[in-house]
Amino acid sequence: MELQLSETQALIRDTARKFAREVVAPRARATDREERVPADLYAQMGELGLLGVNLPLELGGAAAGAVSYALAMAEISAACASTSVGMAVTNMCGELINAFGTDAQRKTYVTRLATGEAVAGAFE
């Protein structure tokens, strides 16, 4: 059985890999030491579409599916586990609000999560 990534999956993987290697990895030690993922990393992940991989296009997501999400998570996780947890929680919250929230909640929160304007988490 031969499995190949779709063009979208390969693009998301490659985008996440480049970002992880060039931006996330060099800051991983400081991120862990400070016990906080820098806000600008979330903003950059949002710009790249990494915070809404499974969210609908109309809400700022990529609508790219679970395989694309797993590929992106693997790349970010390899560079910095802390950053990947923040990415995972933000994606998860966006997906839950999209699935179970009202239209008003979707418009208010999901778009902000997908773009990195807002970040999900309360781990203080």
Model-derived regions, located:
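Glycine-rich flavin
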Residues: 25-124
